[in-house]
């Protein structure tokens, strides 16, 4: 491998930081919401009595490594008729405070070129009446700060200021140091007057905010963002804390309730540690500085000394109490200017002078590494390192806190951050488990009315109840254990002098997390297809990952593509299309919610299959039975489309020359299209139906001569008439694609886009349907795209143009309404000769679709498929801009004709934002008729979205207003797709492959699809460490550990070496101390077998380890039995005894054989060999039938004779501890914990294990693997600084020191700890048959990516493009992608390696550029757009491993 590409395939999911604030709306927007009056409510009725609701809800902002996401919190209140109509919305958590569901909805998602170190929300201030919005402050290493605000006009975040304190000008801030233990830490003043960022250990950067009305925020700015103003940073300056005689700053926070901003800083005067505590213990100090940002003065106004050395976090107490809480490992302290108090948490707590006794809590707890937030002004919620939730109550009189009171609540996930969301919710962000949104309710009074503390198994968790909830969309899931498990109750202990508060909790939503990935195995799926080849074969496999920690530990089964569960299949050659239709002979006359529920569960009646020259009709009752001969459907030729009209009372079937309206199997009406001279063959051929779009009661037909016909249905008579829209008839412009969009519901969404539309369309008129009940028909629009690339939206049936945009096909980032001049058609015609006409022709839109899925807050999506296979995806949003009206007025004065047709109801406020779809699908259409590729679905196993057919088909599903794309590669190309709901296939689907096989399937119910890849979580309730795969019996052996409480004397006796005759020295311990329990980790090997039904996996065997023995490695190895001459597949386990520091290290190697199929199922594995060795056995591997073991600092090669291992060779160089060992043929690669990598070879002739070369630098390795590119062998290694390096062995090159030194081939900063590499063969594209392997890797952030070899021509092309994209694309938060990818060496001097890896995270921006910019960039680097896109698609296809 000389050149490679770095490609992310699954982005980080472990949440590190979270915050809440009013980012997309202001506090006044939330508090002044006018209740929506439903059409069923009486307008004259009085306003309902106010009841305790959930209050105004801010946004939730989360970061996971380099991912930034902003969510809006949606609450469904009881009695909201629109919500209750949908029976699927049975929310988790039950009803609390009048709210029966709360969910997170994505506003924006960004992949940054840098890892977010800390995050804060800068408040606008100004109380409840403030119309201002908050801003987000992000910090990045080493000292970069970005301030972002939400801009309504582009529906995205935009940067308002950047502050960088790096480079030569700021070198003095580092004071000679090169590395710092943590990145910048940001905190903000609660009133939004300033912010503070701690960088380089002791430099405090003060960010002064601009006050509203000052010069910086001008009137123009306010208008351009829709009249809203966000908090902004005006200037910054630095306070050097060293000048204030501070030495080791641990944390800082801004206090509430001061006229000027006040910072309290927690610092340690002199370092101490556990071994010195008896001599130096209370070493921490608090200092409160009053910040005057105008005069740049910061006097100390109060301070506190003698805080414990293990103090680590500050929490500012809200008004009216004020002051600060100091969290320590064994105590909690409260300090303010006038008062202080403390609380001891366990027996290790001590006061500074040891004379006075600290008040103690009712139970013992360790509070190191806790996170906290406030759920009321006097109650803090603390999340401990074990996942327990504690409630800390401040008991106060006036503003003086008298004492602290700690009570236990329930246990939850192990949190990495926690934030309050409004006054009724909090968000627990987790790197080790799913992140949770929890609602709480506080009641004053006795806690007796509450069920009180429950048992341990009824905690609030994000996992453990997956099986059932996954059948529904992520925001409508339910739980197997029900609401009981999700509530957790806690109360303060009964004390007479405090008003007692009791809290109840309910989990409302969760974000799935697959991190941290410690290890993974690559195994066959249960439903694998043994005959698959090429890309289809890849989808036979799945990744089984060790993720999570402690009680959040789980196996995550990841699959990059979906493999449906097949019910049945039949051969059906020559199929062109399939449709399912409903039919009810009699329709009820009540259009209430029960009818809607019935509609949801109504079975399909007929399946219509279009073949080459005929049509088949099947009845979809209990069995699929063909009824082609006995129905009035048109069966003599192929069908173009079929669907339901008139509320499912009729079926329309459209074929090339006509259409039929059917009531069940009987025809009511037949229409014929085509030329007026139907006798002449050529005439009728000239105009046949090309594509069809149905929106009850209209049917839109596009003919082969590019004309448009509209079939208008009459619901009273259930008949249809043909009309030709005059607007389109008279136009010379050729139409390339068109579709109908039904804007359904009681509040059609697009009506909000027009200021006058409320008057013109009448608000919520109750239209009496034919069925007799009020029916909300909504509005219907026709979306048309022309050959020139322009797009127009017309209302139906009057065909007034309500929205138009030119150059739609070029894929601009934002679309807004701009009238198209008639000249535009002529201009485009002339310009086609000048530009590369082939590229322009290929960007013709061949298919359009517009859809708004069900949900109270959903917005429409607009999809377009271009002739070159590009898929454009736009999400609609509203922006009432002042500028848009100005622009419209000026245009109408220039060209009155452009606006006169539309009247006054143009969709002025409608805008579209282009969003990326993570698809690698790109297939050009031939010049013939493009088949329809997009099929919408509203309920397939509870999911909604669309299916994309073609050569690389896939599913696009909607979760939280976010589209998730999952490919389906198992059947190759798919020709047709439709939904099917009947007795045997509940909410399933049918598709036909290009090979002519019709399959009836369902979606696998066990997978969670609201993730970058479909994932199934198998809870272990223990920490998984390593996993391997035994292919023959499809078993997964893995190492797990779980905490066990043991008496202290047992633990101490296990720490001494019994064989050496050592005695336990416990004379200084009392008998009470020895009876106390101590928690230790116990290890075992579990052997799991996947369940066929997708349910929980079965544990086939457990192999416990001995006391204080840790299992370090488990691998399936193939050894040659020297006695029989046969190969044996064995399970090898390496362990280490973790004992006292005086005991010599030792470990065991264990070999197990797998039972034969005929054996008793009890004996899945049998121990065949066990041996104790000096040193820890940290890695094992098999090489040419021998077993390679790393035992402490030795590498020993063993021969197996069936009963014992015999050492035949060893390597005794100075590796300290081998973390990774890989074998290819006779070559061995070792990764050491500190001494970088070693490259060895094994020669069987002389039984030699010899060192070929090594890296002479020191490097803390995490994972290693061989990278194979044809005949070239390279060595890849990941390290503790989040880099990846690729080395090669070149003994003939002079700089390799006669071959002893490995040379650098590439280096790259990943930005995450890579914990495991896996070498997988790439799918070769076309004629290129080079044997190439890519490295798939997993990280501790929950992300997956790969390093894939490239040939030089491709690399040079992509590298040139990458350099151009650095400047051509605006980067979120102003981060430089090249700087992010530079190798990090933590200040160590080193020679930089070659730049031979391209970054696909930057290259993927190319596809999102408008066509003109894509062509210009390609021209600048001397290539074509086609070549660049082909390279990117080939790379995606080649690395579709799962």
Curated annotation (Swiss-Prot):
Signal peptide: none annotated. One of its GO terms (cellular component) is nucleus. GO terms for biological process: mRNA processing. It comes from the Eukaryota. Gene3D superfamilies: YVTN repeat-like/Quinoprotein amine dehydrogenase. GO terms for molecular function: RNA binding. It is found in: Nucleus. Keywords: mRNA processing, Nucleus, RNA-binding. InterPro entries: Beta-prop_RSE1/DDB1/CPSF1_1st, Cleavage/polyA-sp_fac_asu_C, RSE1/DDB1/CFT1/CPSF1, WD40/YVTN_repeat-like_dom_sf. Pfam families: Beta-prop_RSE1_1st, Beta-prop_RSE1_2nd, CPSF_A. Belongs to the CPSF1 family. Component of the CPSF complex, at least composed of CPSF160, CPSF100, CPSF73-I, CPSF73-II, CPSF30, FY and FIPS5. Forms a complex with cleavage and polyadenylation specificity factor (CPSF) subunits FY, CPSF30, CPSF73-I, CPSF 73-II and CPSF100. CPSF plays a key role in pre-mRNA 3'-end formation, recognizing the AAUAAA signal sequence and interacting with poly(A)polymerase and other factors to bring about cleavage and poly(A) addition. This subunit is involved in the RNA recognition step of the polyadenylation reaction. This is Cleavage and polyadenylation specificity factor subunit 1. The lineage of its organism: Eukaryota, Viridiplantae, Streptophyta, Embryophyta, Tracheophyta.
